[in-house]
């Protein structure tokens, strides 16, 4: 089972694209190191306070994949500098 989550977020403290990318890189790197998922920025790459990223997880069951994605989203929510506004989930 493949689970995919697309998240749109606001980065309030980013005053430039450079600051946005520094915050985003730190978060994405920590997610990749802690969880067995793929994550990448997929939208709003030239907008300095908004971002959209995709997270993909693969496992043998939907329940396990859903739990992994929920843990990743909770971990992302623990960062005070980013606020998740919209999340869409798909299953393949």
UniProtKB/Swiss-Prot annotation:
InterPro entries: DUF503, TT1725-like_sf. Signal peptide: none annotated. It holds the Pfam family DUF503. PANTHER family: DUF503 DOMAIN-CONTAINING PROTEIN, HYPOTHETICAL CYTOSOLIC PROTEIN. This is Uncharacterized protein YlxP. It comes from Bacillus subtilis (strain 168). The lineage of its organism: Bacteria, Bacillati, Bacillota, Bacilli, Bacillales.
């Amino acid at each position: 089972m493949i689970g995919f989550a697309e998240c749109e977020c606001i980065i309030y403290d980013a005053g430039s694209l450079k600051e946005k990318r520094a915050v985003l890189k730190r978060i994405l790197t920590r997610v990749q190191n802690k969880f067995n998922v793929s994550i990448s920025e997929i939208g709003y790459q030239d907008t300095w306070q908004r971002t959209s990223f995709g997270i993909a997880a693969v496992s043998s069951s939907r329940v396990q994949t859903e739990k992994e994605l929920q843990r990743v989203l909770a971990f992302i929510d623990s960062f005070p500098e980013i606020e998740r506004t919209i999340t869409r989930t798909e299953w393949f």
